[in-house]
Amino acid sequence: MKKSISALFIATALIFSATTVFAASGSSIFGSEGCIACHTINGLGGSVGPDLSHVGSKRSLSWLKTQITNPDANFAAGSTVTIDGKSYMAIMPGHKHMAASKLNTLAAYLESLK
């Protein structure tokens, strides 16, 4: 019984640690790739683009990956996009050459924002 509880405690701690590292990695990429210059998360960042604080409750992982690498696939460049009642110009640069590992981490981080 004690071994089971210890194993459960260790597994929970590892999951919590991995989640914390994952969130920190995604947040770091969000900053280093310049996303924060235009987008807000929890009150921090720019206001040129939509607030992404809860983007994970609205968009799928696949949609987010497409939006990051090829924003014109979802919104025509130069068009006006209305999200949550606020209008934005579709001017986001694509990150077609972002390494797959970075893209996956960033998109998963954004999807986790619920």
What would you call each of these model-derived segments?
Residues 1-24, 67, 74, 98, ...:
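Post-cleavage N-terminal segment of exported redox proteins
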Residues 13-31, 50, 60-63:
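Electrostatic cytochrome c docking/interface patches
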Residues 30-33, 87:
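Disulfide-bonded cysteine motifs in exported proteins
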Residues 33-41, 64, 106, 110:
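The canonical Cys-X-X-Cys-His
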Residues 38-45, 57, 69:
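Detector for the c-type heme attachment site
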Residues 46-55, 71-105, 113:
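Axial heme c-ligation environment in periplasmic c-type cytochrome domains
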